[in-house]
Amino acid sequence: MSNSVNSSKYQPLTTRQGDRIAVVSGIRTPFAKQSTAFSTTPAVDLGKLAVKALMDKTDIDPKLIDQVVFGQVVQMPEAPNIAREIVLGTGMNIGTDAYSVTRACATSFQTTANVVESIMAGTIDIGIAGGADSSSVLPIGVSKKLASTLLALSKTKTVYQKLSLLRTLSLKDIAPVPPAVAEYSTGISMGQTAEQMAKSHGITREEQDALAHRSHTLAAKAWKDGLIQDEVMTAFPEPYTAWLDHDNNIRHDSDLASYAKLRPAFDHKYGSVTAANSTPLTDGGAALLLMSEKRAKELGYEPLGYIRSFAFSAIDVHHDMLMGPSYATPMALDKAGISLSDLTLIDMHEAFAAQTLSNVKMFASNKFAKEYLGRDKAIGEIDMEKFNVLGGSIAYGHPFAATGARMIIQTLRELKRRGGGLGLNTACAAGGLGAAMVLEVE
């Protein structure tokens, strides 16, 4: 255990018998930009694709799966419990427990943590965690006025009563209402927050564009070098006329100069956040198979790695709302009994280049550590040679509930390629939430 961490906060994640919690395997769908390859595929079907592929990949007996914890951020009213629908749609035992959770962009970190805790408690032996989201198949709502009028219409008896109610509606009342993109409590959008963070922390347009270019360049190289293919299934979405086996947002010919041509997306006059230095709306799903180290050995599996620790944070939503990684990471490191310098890899969710670079700054800020974290000093400066080495969400895309699982799979596989070590996954999330998870590979 590193001398620079608080040993009193060390919390090993093991079962009562002392077994670590293993990630046996993981797989995901390709990530597709909104309204492209998965334009008619709802989140529940993306989740089914990923989980069925995971079951096929591991050849696990479906009867051995005790629980599925799955998440989705953009809810489908017709299938609110996506986890149970996945159980029913993938050939699992009908008695398999399943429940759904949502923690915005950190959702599949939460589903993973929930399965880990259930295994630790001994309430289950084997679980599947993950998440899926569609930004193409959206729950389009109606105005409050139209909703109340439709309800009243259902109770009328005469044509005259119906016509009288319909006359009260304006064109504005009958216009469709898309899902909200702003915080319910403040009305501030993620993009507006990214702009605020860029201005508050001195993140320039050039720095943001450079990070986006780096993300695409590294992701393109990872695909070209064959590092990603084995964790991505080939998907045949309805109507089964085409297939997809790669992420279609990555710029394989990324040119830094081209990023400067885009106009700011949120602050049109003074802004620096653009569509190119932000992660795009994306469709996709991802899933992980977890069990105790002992159970994995009994079944003949060689784990990808282990969950060493996790932590979640919550901060104010009015200012620096996407600074969650800077709050959650110190807690996760303490619980793992390590320091930042002990890490082999660091993978931070790139919601926006501005948010990512702001967090990178705060990791190294003693002032931030003292004023906001109550710590004597910063956790340290990030070694960029360890940071998002295969690219990040700006390149791969961001199906909200699937991103955490994508990061876990990718980091564990890269650690294994490098001969083992410790990895950090961390993400910001709407509502001022943050997540951090330490992974271990021998």
UniProtKB/Swiss-Prot annotation:
Catalytic activity: an acyl-CoA + acetyl-CoA = a 3-oxoacyl-CoA + CoA
Alphabetized UniProt keyword annotations: Acyltransferase, Cytoplasm, Fatty acid metabolism, Lipid degradation, Lipid metabolism, Transferase
Active-site residue numbers: C105 (acyl-thioester intermediate), H398 (proton acceptor), C428 (proton acceptor)
Top-level class of the enzyme under EC nomenclature: transferase
E.C. no: 2.3.1.16
Pathway: Lipid metabolism; fatty acid beta-oxidation
Organism superkingdom: Bacteria
Subcellular location field: Cytoplasm
Subunit note: Heterotetramer of two alpha chains (FadJ) and two beta chains (FadI).
Family label: Belongs to the thiolase-like superfamily. Thiolase family.
Protein name as annotated: 3-ketoacyl-CoA thiolase
Organism annotation: Aliivibrio fischeri (strain ATCC 700601 / ES114)
